[in-house]
Amino acid sequence: MGDVSYIVDSLGLPPFSYQMSLLSFTEKGPQELLQLLSDVFSTISPKHQKVDVAKEVPDQTADRLIGFLKIIKYRPNVQDPLLFRQLVAAGDRETLYQILRWVVPQAQLLEKRAFVGYYLSFPDMPEEFNFDPDIMELKEEIKAMQQEFIELHKSSDAIKTLSKDTQALKNKIKSLEEEKERLGEKVERAKGAVDKLPDRSSYMEVCTNLRKQQDEEVNLSTAIQTQRALQEKAEASYHRAAARLRELQTSYQEGSAGKLLETLNEDVKNLRAQVNERYPKEVEKRQKRQAALSEALASGISTEMDLQRLQHQATALHNQITEIQERKVAQDKARQGDKAYLQLRQAQQMATVSARKKEELGAKQERLQEKKTALTAQLDKLNAEGGGSGAVFSEEEWRTKYESMKSKLPIYKKMKKELGDLEAEVFVLAHTEELLASQEGGLLEKVKRLEKQQGISGFTETAQHLEKVSEAKSQMDEEKGMTLIEISRTVEEINNAINQRKQQLAPQIKKLRSVRQDFAEFEAKYLEKKTAYDNVVATFEARTSALEGEVSGLKAEVSENETKYHMLHCQLHITDQNIKKVTSGPAAERLRDKYEAKVKEAEDSTKALRDRQREIKDTHSTGLSQIDIMNDMLRLLQLKLNLARGIAVDMSQYGGGGGAAGGANGGMAGQTYDTGSANVLQL
């Protein structure tokens, strides 16, 4: 569950910025998880285009995702590639969670790895083509170009790294040149001062000897420190060995094999605890430290810009950690009602407390062991100084000490008796005080009863209160009088001090006035210069920002053009290889024969079509005249048919040019018809 929460939190950060909750993420199905994984890959690498997984075959989706994972060098937990492919194609939740858990946190690193891996990977092809001579030659050329790409990419990164801190390097070079000039001036002045000395050679010889002696002194002090460290180490080992020897001698003198065995078992237990618990932790810490230092040294950080970039990254990571902690606290608050979660948190807290107590006890044990070793070493040292006999005090010293204690014994007894008398007196006084207090309480009760009988209850308390108030008032008045006297004395002292101080400060005040006038003039000049400086800085910053924007745009354009150049170069090379493949070899002969046959067949077809075209051109005019004759015949026959039926016909629809002319009575006789161009009898 922790990995899922971490994945959701990481997906909410740039460059992904997926706004989803833990519940919505866990409710996603296999297809939705595959779509999310594909979108994450497309965000990391623009070469991995966004694809709708629903419209894609599962095997094709699995091959595409696994191919990208190979490029970014992902190592699955499943050793069998076929099983891993099946799990990805099926959208197995655990497998996809592991991939997301590995990919999402290191998007920036994988982006660079995907860019480089895209150009360093070979295209997929069937196995039977791998041993083709042309394919093998092409692979060798691709390998050579990949090596060239690696070198160019490294040089490009180095140039980009150097170009980041150009201004910082310029400033550093300028400061070094100024420092060089100052040092040169100092050297020249020193040479001039030395040349003026009458016995310059003797001074030079003395200075040289002094420098040699100083270097020798430094070397000797270093050697002394080294020898002292070795001596302390040897003394510590000697004390440990002496303590061990003393323990063994004690065990041997006691004659108890069980005691000796118990001691050895305890030592073995302590050593085993150190080997199994303490030393692995220290080794792990040192390995992590060494790895961090190695990475820092390998990164080649040598400029202030790099340090600032790392500081910004550290700040961003701290902010992310803070956000994650706040989100975790919010989630913990939201889960307060979950009984199982509360039990789990309680168990985790108990385990944490137990581990902390265990570490504290281990540290305490180590401190006690070190203290024991130090005390043992001190005891051994005292024994060694005492001649190795094991006795700290001699017999004469014991006798002197005994006589001193014997002479002080009467004083001790006398003071002890006085202390007993004082304690008895204190006891009697305390008992008397208790009796008087009880009697006072009884008397106060009697007084209260009498006051109540007389109808003046509370009189005693009021009188006591008034007495206390009067005492407090008198005390306050006395304090007020003393305070007023003290205040008047203090005011007089302050006035005297002020007058005295005024006399002392009079010349300084006059000087201060002139200084204030000078300050006002300098402040006006400063404001004027500051305004001019601000204007210059604003202009410079505007120009700098414009140049930076232009530089970033040009860098982006250069990067895009480099990518296009590499892509077009690869395509051109592939096209050249295809042309070479087509124009040489047995395959080219077969293709040439095939296309020559097709060309010959096309020529024969063209010749036949041309003959057909010529034939059609020859018969075209004859066909048109026959069509006109047939049209005229049809009109003539239609006209004869109409005349036979006795129908007057407008000849214009048959191509005639005029109408019919008749007598006044009309009729068929004496009528004339315009028959157009047809050969028609006149009736």
Curated annotation (Swiss-Prot):
<keyword id="KW-0175">Coiled coil</keyword>
<dbReference type="GO" id="GO:0030992">
    <property type="term" value="C:intraciliary transport particle B"/>
</dbReference>
<feature type="coiled-coil region">
    <location>
        <begin position="587"/>
        <end position="618"/>
    </location>
</feature>
<dbReference type="GO" id="GO:0031514">
    <property type="term" value="C:motile cilium"/>
</dbReference>
<comment type="subunit">
    <text>Component of the IFT complex B, the core composed of IFT25, IFT27, IFT46, IFT52, IFT74, IFT81 and IFT88 as well as associated subunits IFT20, IFT57, IFT80 and IFT172. Interacts with IFT81; the interaction is direct: within the IFT complex B, IFT74 and IFT81 mediate the transport of tubulin within the cilium. Interacts with tubulin; interaction is direct.</text>
</comment>
<dbReference type="GO" id="GO:0015631">
    <property type="term" value="F:tubulin binding"/>
</dbReference>
<keyword id="KW-0970">Cilium biogenesis/degradation</keyword>
<feature type="coiled-coil region">
    <location>
        <begin position="134"/>
        <end position="387"/>
    </location>
</feature>
<feature type="region of interest" description="CH (calponin-homology)-like region">
    <location>
        <begin position="1"/>
        <end position="122"/>
    </location>
</feature>
<keyword id="KW-0966">Cell projection</keyword>
<dbReference type="Pfam" id="PF18383">
    <property type="entry name" value="IFT81_CH"/>
</dbReference>
<dbReference type="GO" id="GO:0060271">
    <property type="term" value="P:cilium assembly"/>
</dbReference>
<dbReference type="InterPro" id="IPR029600">
    <property type="entry name" value="IFT81"/>
</dbReference>
<protein>
    <recommendedName>
        <fullName>Intraflagellar transport protein 81</fullName>
    </recommendedName>
</protein>
<comment type="similarity">
    <text>Belongs to the IFT81 family.</text>
</comment>
<dbReference type="GO" id="GO:0045177">
    <property type="term" value="C:apical part of cell"/>
</dbReference>
<dbReference type="GO" id="GO:0035735">
    <property type="term" value="P:intraciliary transport involved in cilium assembly"/>
</dbReference>
<dbReference type="InterPro" id="IPR043016">
    <property type="entry name" value="IFT81_N_sf"/>
</dbReference>
<comment type="function">
    <text>Component of the intraflagellar transport (IFT) complex B: together with IFT74, forms a tubulin-binding module that specifically mediates transport of tubulin within the cilium. Binds tubulin via its CH (calponin-homology)-like region. Required for ciliogenesis.</text>
</comment>
<dbReference type="InterPro" id="IPR041146">
    <property type="entry name" value="IFT81_CH"/>
</dbReference>
<keyword id="KW-0969">Cilium</keyword>
